[in-house]
Amino acid sequence: MKETIISDIHCIITKPDRHNLITVVVETNEGVTGFGCATFQQRPLAVKTMVDEYLKPILIGKNANNIEDLWQMMMVNAYWRNGPVINNAISGVDMALWDIKAKLAGMPLHQLFGGKSRDAIPVYTHATSDTMEGIYDLVEGFLEKGYKHIRCQLGFYGGVPTDLHTTQNPTEGSYYDQDQYMDNTLTMFKSLREKYGNQFHILHDVHERLFPNQAIQFAKEVEQYKPYFIEDILPPNQTEWLDNIRSQSSVSLGLGELFNNPEEWKSLIANRRIDFIRCHVSQIGGITPALKLGHLCQNFGVRIAWHCPPDMTPIGAAVNTHLNVHLHNAAIQEHVEYNGNTHKVFPNAAEPINGYLYASEIAGIGVEIDREAAAEFPVMYRPHEWTQSRLPDGAIHTP
């Protein structure tokens, strides 16, 4: 097979909407260019530096066809490995290499994987509001569009706090009360079931906001409303408590968006402590490890629901769709509809049709970046207040 030599690599950071989005561009001597998602929006410049200063020098002149070898080299070259900055940087290159290979083969990415196991993947979207009336309005609109799975949140993560009993001169941060959050969320579930019955599946993201004993209680009480799954009921460093939850509740659990290292998910899958793996594909290093993870999950009856939030390029979202139509144990894909600027920067970005996402049939990933349009929306960074989550006494808590 003729070698395809990597001739250049660079990063593009753009902010067409609320989030800084990072795209890696890999060029070859064959004139075929690949694009990959490397978005770590809280540390965009760190990822760009990793790509431009550390990965590019070891990749120029290498054969782009040897994806597995290049992935392994990128992962171990710094000796220290499996962190969010390096994994996202590797992901951007890895996705771009798969994009190149599929373009050279003249087939869409899912066909390169081995073809489809389904026609399309069901989608869930987000209905978030500070009031139940606001949630109802959003739900009505999504039902009209054909969605059958909706993640419902009363307020931002941690809920809508009222009458917080804080300290004098409290430390700056985003405050919430765990008991209020649990009570309000259970009331939300009850109200949605009373109003809509089983017209749609309800999902909910705890987003690590509870202590383990509270998570057990919440899982027991929310079970009666039959959520499709409860996401991130515990942080990654408390997953041994999942056995306690499993022994007291049959509620379906999704976990994994913060995972970087295979050691974080292997025992959860092998011991069937979760129902859905929620890894963020760029956060674990791209397509190469995602395919392996998907196959591992299938052996243990764990289904796939990749993390696919707005702070991901449409390139990364398209990769998720290709993975989902290929992997037999894929269950659902998260999606928040794009604004006009995002469609301008990323032509062919897919939107759901009647509650389903369809994989592109264009050779490669099927979504690229318009570099001129991207330049209209330069990177902007500010510290994120929502990740400075605090309890009423001022103690910081996992966001």
UniProtKB/Swiss-Prot annotation:
Pfam families: MR_MLE_C (PF13378), MR_MLE_N (PF02746). One of its GO terms (biological process) is amino acid catabolic process. One of its GO terms (molecular function) is magnesium ion binding. The keyword Metal-binding applies. Keywords: Magnesium, Metal-binding. D-arabinonate binds at H207, E257, R278, H307, E334. InterPro entries: D-mannonate_dehydratase-like, DgoD-like, Enolase-like_C_sf, Enolase-like_N, Enolase_C-like, Mandel_Rmase/mucon_lact_enz_CS, Mandelate_racemase_C, Mandelate_racemase_N_dom. Mg(2+) binds at D205, E231, E257. Disulfide bonds: none annotated. Belongs to the mandelate racemase/muconate lactonizing enzyme family. GalD subfamily. Has no detectable activity with D-mannonate and with a panel of 70 other acid sugars (in vitro), in spite of the conservation of the residues that are expected to be important for catalytic activity and cofactor binding. May have evolved a divergent function. Homotetramer. This is D-galactonate dehydratase family member VSWAT3_13707.
